[in-house]
């Protein structure tokens, strides 16, 4: 899909999608752990749909009713699962399949097969799980001899740690050691999901999982703060829009909820409503190790705010769905911003502003960042591959149309 964005201005409540980090974990854990549940407040992203298809392949029946999903679990080992381009579903499913004693072939998109997985395979291998790389670049899992010994894992991805947490939950409990956990906030999301489904996780250097015997049958899934960031940036950089959000329960479990702290002087909270006040009055700094998904939207601030943006520990961005380190630099330079790289951090500041006529990315977050930058720049811009935003935010352009003109060209 190709769209043109222009004419920024308007007032409204931007409706955010549910957190796919929570949703995918709830769906997969419910299906594999045989805990039937109703999830409320759901927006089905492409990644959520992948998790739901995996749940169906392991015997669950899924019923969708408006923004609720009912998962009726009846676990069975699948011969094959398809993980699309969802790193979360891929990595979490490996641990769950292994713990379940399954012999399963995994398929997915080529781009995902290239992303790191080895630390997880090594840790599971120490527990007797066998892996064989298939012609698609993914791994066939053989968990028939899986055990629950104490192992160690390198936490270079929080998804590796979360996968092991689910592994030991499926095994009825256990413990393991995690070293140097990156983006630990996502591990706490997994802890919350396990707690809601009847398991207590104690997270220290040694992570311990134990069943509690009590779980919820209906769960409200909170909205996604990384998606909120795009519209927050829109409101921060423009006084021609009045951007508001409505959140039933403001939770701080999601790592990306840090945006409420970063811009505490620019938001007004009144009950369930959050209102964005325009104006950036100080430099913005974000840690890519902790909040990689905030880097694309916040980089737009660097393009237009005289105070600039610092993206710390940018190496993390190179192993996301695309090389977002390169994508962020490309976007900034397209709009004429100055970018400095000291080998660890990126610094983005305004330069001689340019206005690209057409912008084309394949990464969903870069497409959304480009759309926001185009509107702040004030020049009509054609955005290609607009459909790819459905990976995390299916209604992005519908919500954007509350504050600008969005014309579908093809």
Curated annotation (Swiss-Prot):
Catalysed reactions, as listed in the record: 3-phosphoshikimate + phosphoenolpyruvate = 5-O-(1-carboxyvinyl)-3-phosphoshikimate + phosphate
EC code(s) of this entry: 2.5.1.19
InterPro entries, per database record: Enolpyruvate_Tfrase_dom, Enolpyruvate_Tfrase_sf, EPSP_synthase, EPSP_synthase_CS, RNA3'P_cycl/enolpyr_Trfase_a/b
Listed SUPFAM superfamilies: EPT/RTPC-like
GO molecular function: 3-phosphoshikimate 1-carboxyvinyltransferase activity
Residue numbers annotated as active site: 293
Keyword Acyltransferase: no
GO BP terms: amino acid biosynthetic process; aromatic amino acid family biosynthetic process; chorismate biosynthetic process
Keywords: Amino-acid biosynthesis, Aromatic amino acid biosynthesis, Cytoplasm, Transferase
GO terms under cellular component: cytoplasm
Group of enzyme by EC: transferase
Annotated Pfam families: EPSP_synthase (PF00275)
Taxonomy, superkingdom: Archaea
Entry's localization field: Cytoplasm
Chain positions recorded as phosphoenolpyruvate binding sites: 20, 87, 115, 159, 324, 365, 391
Chain residues that bind 3-phosphoshikimate: 20-21, 25, 157-159, 183, 293, 320
Pathway annotation from the record: Metabolic intermediate biosynthesis; chorismate biosynthesis
Keyword flag Ion transport: no
Summary of the function given for this chain in its UniProt record: Catalyzes the transfer of the enolpyruvyl moiety of phosphoenolpyruvate (PEP) to the 5-hydroxyl of shikimate-3-phosphate (S3P) to produce enolpyruvyl shikimate-3-phosphate and inorganic phosphate.
Family recorded in the similarity comment: Belongs to the EPSP synthase family.
Assembly description: Monomer.
Protein name in the entry: 3-phosphoshikimate 1-carboxyvinyltransferase
Taxonomic lineage: Archaea, Methanobacteriati, Thermoplasmatota, Thermoplasmata, Thermoplasmatales
């Amino acid at each position: 899909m190709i769209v043109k964005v222009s004419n920024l201005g308007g007032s409204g409540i931007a409706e955010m999608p549910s957190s796919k980090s929570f949703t995918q974990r709830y769906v997969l854990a419910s299906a594999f752990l045989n805990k039937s549940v109703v999830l409320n407040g759901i927006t089905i992203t492409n990644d959520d749909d992948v998790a739901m298809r995996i749940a169906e392949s392991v015997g669950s029946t899924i019923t969708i009713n408006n923004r609720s999903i009912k998962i009726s679990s009846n676990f069975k080992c699948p011969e094959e699962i398809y993980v699309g381009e969802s790193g979360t579903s891929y990595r979490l499913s490996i641990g769950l399949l292994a713990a379940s004693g399954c012999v399963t072939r995994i398929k997915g998109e080529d781009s995902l097969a290239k992303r790191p997985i080895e630390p997880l395979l090594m840790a599971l291998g120490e527990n007797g799980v066998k892996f064989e790389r298939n012609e698609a670049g993914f791994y066939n899992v053989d968990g028939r001899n899986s055990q629950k010994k104490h192992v160690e894992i390198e936490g270079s991805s929080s998804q590796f740690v979360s996968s092991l947490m689910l592994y030991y939950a499926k095994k009825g409990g256990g413990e393991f050691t995690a070293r140097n956990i990156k983006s630990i906030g996502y591990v706490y999301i997994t802890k919350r999901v396990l707690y809601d489904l009847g398991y207590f996780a104690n997270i220290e250097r040694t992570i311990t999982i134990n069943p509690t015997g009590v779980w919820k049958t209906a769960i409200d899934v909170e909205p996604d703060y990384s998606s909120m960031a795009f519209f927050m940036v829109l409101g921060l950089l423009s006084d021609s829009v009045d951007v508001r959000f409505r959140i039933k329960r403001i939770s701080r479990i999601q790592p990306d909820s840090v945006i409420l702290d970063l811009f505490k002087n620019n938001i007004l909270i009144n009950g369930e409503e959050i209102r964005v006040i325009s104006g950036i009055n100080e430099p913005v700094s974000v840690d890519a190790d902790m909040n990689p998904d905030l880097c694309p939207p916040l980089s737009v601030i660097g393009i237009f705010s005289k105070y600039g943006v610092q993206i710390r520990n940018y190496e993390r961005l190179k192993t996301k769905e695309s090389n977002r380190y390169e994508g962020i630099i490309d976007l900034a330079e397209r709009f004429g911003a100055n970018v400095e790289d000291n080998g660890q951090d990126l610094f983005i500041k305004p330069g001689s502003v340019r206005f690209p006529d057409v912008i084309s990315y394949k990464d969903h977050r870069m497409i959304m960042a480009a759309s926001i930058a185009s509107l702040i720049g004030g020049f009509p811009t054609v955005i290609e591959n607009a459909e790819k935003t459905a990976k995390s935010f299916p209604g992005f352009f519908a919500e954007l149309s509350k504050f600008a003109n969005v014309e579908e060209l093809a």
